[in-house]
């Protein structure tokens, strides 16, 4: 009887520990998603700040008679990894470029991204995924004033049933502005 009671008690404790582990995994996945949302927001704000900073520098140059030079913005690498059983990772970003001035204007931009995830599990389980996207935008204006803007977005997602997964996101966006005197 003692052995049966000890066995029953051990099974009960094991079930409690498994429940706690499952809850911890869910909490970790939720926290990872929230963290990634915050990082995506921060990344978008950083790109926007850099864009406006470059635009202001170009306006200062134009007002002082130096003309507007090329504007190159944001090469961003964002890697997120998680290392628990049934792990998942998520990566995304936004890149944008903006250029403007007086006179004829020519502008174009390219944004692209590639995400891939790789995770290894137990004795013979293995999981791999990759995803990529590319966005292209450009504008041309000639006349009294010129303005061009471009942005690219890409999103990669991977998850693995093994012990870890990772997503790496790379976004490159550039925009240029050239003035022509008539």
UniProtKB/Swiss-Prot annotation:
An annotated GO cellular component: intermediate filament
Stretches for region Disordered: 157-182
Annotated IF rod domain residues: 1-63
InterPro entries: IF_conserved, IF_rod_dom
Site residues by UniProt (Stutter): 1
SUPFAM superfamilies the record matches: Intermediate filament protein, coiled coil region
Gene3D superfamilies associated with the record: 1.20.5.170
UniProt keyword annotations, A-Z: Coiled coil, Intermediate filament, Keratin
Biased composition (Low complexity): 164-182
One Pfam family in the UniProt entry: Filament
Annotated spans, Tail: 63-182
Location of region: Coil 2: 1-63
UniProt record similarity statement: Belongs to the intermediate filament family.
Subunit structure and binding partners: Heterotetramer of two type I and two type II keratins.
Other notes: There are two types of cytoskeletal and microfibrillar keratin: I (acidic; 40-55 kDa) and II (neutral to basic; 56-70 kDa).
Name this polypeptide is given: Keratin, type II cytoskeletal 60 kDa, component III
Source taxonomy: Eukaryota, Metazoa, Chordata, Craniata, Vertebrata
